[in-house]
Amino acid sequence: IAKQFTKSIEIGYFCKKFKKHNFIFLQKTHMSTTQLYEKEVTLQADRRRSGVELIKIISDLWYDKSIELVLFRNHLIDRNVSEILNLHEYAGEFVGKPISILDSVEIASVILSLDLPPSKLDIGKLTYEYGLLDEKYPDARHFVIDKLKEAKTSDEIQPKDVVLYGFGRIGRLLARELMSKTGKGDQMRLRAIVTRDKNDATSLEKRASLLRYDSIHGDFNGSVIADPANNALIINGTTVHMITANTPEEIDYTAYNIDNALVIDNTGAFTTQEALSRHLTSKGTDKVLLTAPGKGVPNIVHGVNQNEYNPDEVNIFSAASCTTNAITPILKAIEDTLGVVKGHLETIHAYTNDQNLVDNMHKKYRRGRAAALNMVITETGAGS
């Protein structure tokens, strides 16, 4: 549309769909500002409708098939339309190429139509690769089928009961994650929380309040109701028993209809194989996971060594330290690509509940100093 522009003609933009990648481009043409605005409104409405459609597919996949869609590792479950669109903008900046929500809807629709096992799929990665390889495939369906052809069928999944042993900072964050990942309830299910202190109506409400809001991580996007009559927390409509115990051995989880449970110890009180084995003497337990570095047990950093141990043969695992999880993936990438001869590691850590707010006596010299001013830590749990 090439004509001489004159002073009497107002230059605007014309919204046009470019078929090749379903991207939306703006083309200069003769159009008034009002017409331009109307086109922009129409375009935005189309994109938001696509966002609604994608949210519906994401929910259907998660609650019907236990398939979770993510966008470059960003969770999409419980997101609203604006957040979905914003994540697509972020994804485009991340890969240096527009990521169209129209393509995402097309690919997600194909995934929904296929018979796939429970899994986590990165729709951002799939959409990006489809944009690069679309000339190789006649349509999105052929592309998705080819990319996921190695997906294996799985036996019927058996739900896994989960018990949080400890309900401090880490325990509450774990509770958030577990409840947000419940889905249709055929994978990990949070059934109970163990604390040393007895729970009455007041303490239960305090624990509920701490779960509802975290000073760093903000609001929990769900409902938490204290149920003193049954000594439980009702989280997102699901009963989670609150159990009081001083030692692991004294608990009978089967009394709460909990069996073959995964016990996640986040207390920091039991860190050796001998100490953690005490959980396995409790009736109703099957596996133990430690949220700190453990001695004499496999320390697992996912993405690095998770395949070195058979979970059918090992009952106790450690998730390693925060420092180890932070540095190991980077070190592995450097080691695999270039090789590492030697190195020096420095870690910066937030102060913890064990430190004093003001100077006071402590069994460790530096931890006796005021936490907010003490920038020299005494030790790290980073594994060698």
Go through each PLM region and give its residues:
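Short, positively charged and aromatic/hydrophobic N-terminal segments
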Residues: 9, 13-27
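Generic detection of intrinsically disordered/low-complexity segments and helix-coil linkers/edges
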Residues: 7-8, 17-19, 56, 345
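N-terminal Rossmann-like NAD(P) cofactor-binding subdomain of oxidoreductases
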Residues: 32-356, 364
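Exposed boundary/loop context
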Residues: 5-8, 159-161
